[in-house]
Amino acid sequence: MASQKKQLFKIIILGDSGVGKTSLMNQYVNARFTQQYRATVGADFMAKEVMIDDRMVTLQIWDTAGQERFQSLGGAFYRGADCCVLVYDITNPKSFDSLDSWRDEFLMQGQPKDPEHFPFVVLGNKLDKATERKVQESKSQQWCKSHGNIQFFEVSAKDATNIEQAFQDIAKAAASQEKDEEIFFPTTVTLTKQDPKKQTKQGGCC
C-alpha cells in the first residue's frame, strides 16, 4: 500500500454571534473587511491555498452560526474537522465565558478520534478596540494553559493584525493530525489479457 498526504484540511470556526468569525475568515482569505454586520445562517465556508512544510495544501474554513437556534446543525458541519478555532471578542466578557461551552459542544458533536489531543486554537478578536478591552490577555492565556496549552492569538479582523500568523499556525495544527489519519491508496495493479489461443482446455462438469 502506498500512502499519500492529505491535500485538504477542514477548519471549523466557533464562537458567539457577533465576535467576528465571518470577518476573520474574509480578512484571511480575501484581505477584505466590511463594517456591515450580517449574521451567518447555518454555515458557510471559504477555501485558501497555503504552503505548509514545503507543500501546497488547501484550507477549507467553515464559518458557523453563533445563534443557539442553529447549534443543533453543528454535528453535520463539525465532523471531519482537522482543527477547531474558538473566537471571542476582547470587549465582550460573555463571549469569552462561552469558550468552554463551544469547546465542549465541538467535542460532543464533532466526535474527533482523539479528543484529548485534538488541536484547538483560540483567537481574541477586535484588538483594534484595545482601549475598550474587557478581557485581559493574561486571563485568556491562563484559560488556554488550563485546557492543554491551546495556542492563543489576539487579532484584529479589521486591520489584519496577527491574522496571517494565526492562520499559519492553525494550518500547521491541522496538518499535525494527519500522522494518524494518512490516506492510503493501493499500489497499481496491471491486468494482462491472456491470449485465447494459449489457454488450455480443462475437462470437467459444470
Curated annotation (Swiss-Prot):
Q: Which domain of life is it from?
A: Eukaryota
Motif Effector region: residue span? 37-45
Entry-annotated residues carrying Phosphothreonine:
T34, T40, T64
Which coarse location class applies to the principal site listed for this UniProt protein?
cytoplasm
Residue numbers of Phosphoserine PTMs: S17, S23, S72
Family annotation (PROSITE patterns): RAB (PS51419)
Alphabetically, the GO molecular function entries are: GTP binding; GTPase activity
| Residues the record lists as Phosphotyrosine modifications | Y78, Y88
Keywords recorded for this protein, A-Z: Cytoplasm, Cytoskeleton, Glycoprotein, GTP-binding, Lipoprotein, Nucleotide-binding, Phosphoprotein, Prenylation
Quote the cellular component terms of the Gene Ontology held in the record: cytoplasm; microtubule; oral apparatus
Q: Where is this gene product found?
A: Cytoplasm, Cytoskeleton
Any signal peptide, and if so, which residues?
none
Q: How this protein is processed and modified after translation, per its record?
A: Glycosylated.
Q: Which SUPFAM superfamilies match?
A: P-loop containing nucleoside triphosphate hydrolases
Entries under SMART domains matching the protein = RAB (SM00175), RAN (SM00176), RAS (SM00173), RHO (SM00174)
Give the matching InterPro entries. P-loop_NTPase, Small_GTP-bd, Small_GTPase
Name the residues that bind GTP: 15-22, 34-40, 63-67, 125-128, 157-158
State what induces this protein.
Answer: Expression increases by 55% during phagocytosis (at protein level).
Q: Which family does it belong to?
A: Belongs to the small GTPase superfamily. Rab family.
What PANTHER family does its record include?
Answer: RAB FAMILY, RAS-RELATED PROTEIN RAB-7A
Q: Report what the protein is called.
A: Ras-related protein Rab-7b
